Amino acid sequence: MKRPNNRPTNTMSLILCLTLSSLCVSSQSASVHGKNFATNRAVKSSSPFVVLSPDDNVVSMSGENGYRSALREAFDKSSRDYDDNGEDVFSNEKRRLRFHKRRLRFDRRDQDEGNFRRFPTNAVSMSADENSPFDLSNEDGAVYQRDLRAPRLRFYSLRKRAAGGMEQSEGQNPETESHSRRKRSVLTPSLSSLGESLESGISKRISINQDLKAITDMLLTEQIRERQRYLADLRQRLLEKGKRSSGVSLLTSNKDEEQRELLKAISNLLD
């Protein structure tokens, strides 16, 4: 029998050992970019304000001594901000990291070494538009931060309107003058104003009905009086005409019988 060939197995094991050794060597080494340093484990949790530049010098570390020297080199410029009191560098490592990140974020002095962009905290001077009729920072004297205030809209919210203080500024602007509180109350009245307007409308309607009834009664009374005067005048004329004709024609001729009967009927009707 032939002996089994173990060369492929030996080759695979050799490749695996070389790979593991290279991984171990790479995990023990790290790099420092300028004064902003981070290990492979701490890169994910680093602050977004720590910006690494490709122009920075890369310092390789080998062992504990290289790491200590990198730490001292990274914080030698900011050592004036603390008091070491002769202690070791690693005793205040976390505090130094926190202070370094805070200084990168909030320091307003000129940073010649860093390539990050500083965000101004007082954004009123940059965001306030003097020509904009909707910016109230200069008119009301209030200071608004860009990250804390609402976006600029044409109309303000009801909460700001109810708080007051914007009525005067709205009246000064020609574009928002038509939407002031005084004119808006006419377009959209409240419940109390609706009730008052309803009561006033009812009272006006009642007064108008009463006036119409009084006018109608007065006209009817005048018509009745005019009719009574007309009938009295007509009766008086008929009576006078009958008296004048009765003395001449009624006694001398029988032709006037019909007229006499007619006059009697008219006189009885008028009486």
From Swiss-Prot:
InterPro entries: ELH (IPR003424). One of its GO terms (cellular component) is extracellular region. Residues 162-190 are annotated as: Disordered. The modification Lysine amide is found at residue 241. Keywords: Amidation, Cleavage on pair of basic residues, Hormone, Neuropeptide, Secreted, Signal. GO terms for molecular function: hormone activity. Coiled coil: none annotated. It is found in: Secreted. Residues 1-28 form the signal peptide. Pfam families: ELH. Bag cell neurons. Its main location: secreted. Residues 29-95, 162-184 form a propeptide. One of its GO terms (biological process) is neuropeptide signaling pathway. Disulfide bonds: none annotated. ELH acts as a neurotransmitter locally, upon neurons of the abdominal ganglion and as a hormone by diffusing into the circulating hemolymph and modulating the activity of other organs. It specifically causes contraction of smooth muscle in the ovotestis and expulsion of the egg string. Alpha-BCP decreases the activity of a cluster of neurons in the left upper quadrant of the abdominal ganglion. Belongs to the molluscan ELH family. This is ELH. It comes from Aplysia californica.
